[in-house]
């Protein structure tokens, strides 16, 4: 792989991370789990800062812009949730959501570790 392909792949993964953390923060806000939401907001901002540093590094060292690949991450929020309000959420839904979201996040972080 060329340096351009490597940087592009990493940046694409970072964009996906930003979207994942944003969706998780929204989901946890919906579930009334503010601490989890704040954590994922923070992770989203950290991911964004890292991506900006990567872009800056690539531009200052290689004097090129990073070509943006098209990607579509898997949705975090289940489609069925859009017909409910946060008042409809019960303890069982929160428990299952925390378990599912944490598993997805851990898997994504494992993919990130493998990629880097």
What is the meaning of each model-derived region?
Residues 19, 31-33, 52-54, 65, ...:
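Generic detector of leucine side chains in alpha-helical contexts
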Residues 6-13, 17, 21-24, 76-116:
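Acidic/histidine-rich alpha-helical segments that form the ligand environment
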Residues 34-81:
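Conserved alpha-helical segments that form or flank metal/cofactor-binding pockets of metalloenzymes
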Residues 26-36:
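Inter-helical turn/loop segments and adjacent helix faces that build the functional surface
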